[in-house]
Amino acid sequence: EKELYKKHWIVMILQDVRTAVDAACLGLEILSIIKQNDLPLEFPPQVIEASKRVPKSIKQSELEGRRDLRDLPIVTVDGDDAKDLDDAVYVKQLGKDEFLLGVHIADVSYYVKENAVLDKEARERGTSVYLVDRVLPMLPERLSNGICSLNAGEDRLTMSCEMHIDRKAVSYTHLRAHETCA
């Protein structure tokens, strides 16, 4: 019985070692992909400093002139583990075959001004890169996961497009875009 316990214990240790080795190999593969594609792991100091100057929350004055959609059941369409929630939708049935579809994206341009250091870095990166174990964001996390993320229960500035859809005609009859808060 003691020998059986010893063998079982050794097998358990070997399984743990194999799991650790597999994880390390995956980590090395991901780092290799990052290196091969010259993907930046960090932001330059001036970009981090610029991101710190962006407010963490919206002021009441920033809502003026925007259509208020905060009372609508708008839902994000990102994955469960996503932290950079930048797009959301709302659907309302208007009639038997008619719907209003609202598509909402974070109004990043309100905070990231053209040709500013944040804009130049975002253009250089082009997109956020989603890897198995991490995200290499286009903007610092203070923005991408913060003020520019459509987090539940938090007021955010958005750009919205509403489409009036007729299911019978399989077309939309009205398209309207506007600055909003959601």
Region spans (language model):
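Charge-lined substrate channels and their catalytic hotspots, especially those that engage the 3′ end
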Residues: 1-102, 109-154
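Low-complexity basic/metal-binding stretches
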Residues: 8, 171-172
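Short acidic-glycine loop/turn motifs at beta-strand connectors
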Residues: 93-95, 165-170
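Phosphate/diphosphate-binding loops
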Residues: 158-159, 163
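Single conserved hydrophobic/aromatic residue that forms the stacking wall/gate
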Residues: 174-182
